[in-house]
Amino acid sequence: MKASSLADFAIPINPDARLCVFRLKEQAFVNQRFIRLTLREPPHTDAELVHALLNSTLGMFLIEAAGFGRGLGVLDLNATKLSKTFHMLNPDRPDAAAAARIKAYFRPLLARSIRELPKEIACPDRLDFDSCIAEVYGFVGLEQGIREGAEFLYKIRKSAKD
């Protein structure tokens, strides 16, 4: 494998009830069960901030929207499609103080287990984290709609096993 195949982050290609993006401690190869994400401009890009943004409820909504339900209710993600269509919040937009606030609100989520998506997006620490992101990026008041959209897509996907 080429060094250009190293990942900074990984997303399972078939996540089930728990949806998240993993951050690797250092760049590494990932196997075929994961989609690799690589920072475009390391070391200038804040990997901790990118990790937080990818794991926001908006990030989870965008991941859910990029895939489709496959048997047993798992999400089927395609690396090629994701590389061409996936978007995320711009990590260069927040100033240093705002980026530090986002990361501070994200740390409690890292300190606990990930819950199933409907329970996860209702957790008080996640609500605070998402509110911080909405404030920094200027979409205050839209958080509930984003949560509802993420949960709606999740329920459609999970209904595939019923």
Regions found by a protein language model. Give the residues of each.
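Non-catalytic DNA-recognition/assembly elements of restriction-modification systems
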Residues: 90-162
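Polybasic, glycine- and aromatic-enriched phosphate-binding surface used to engage nucleic acids
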Residues: 1-100, 104
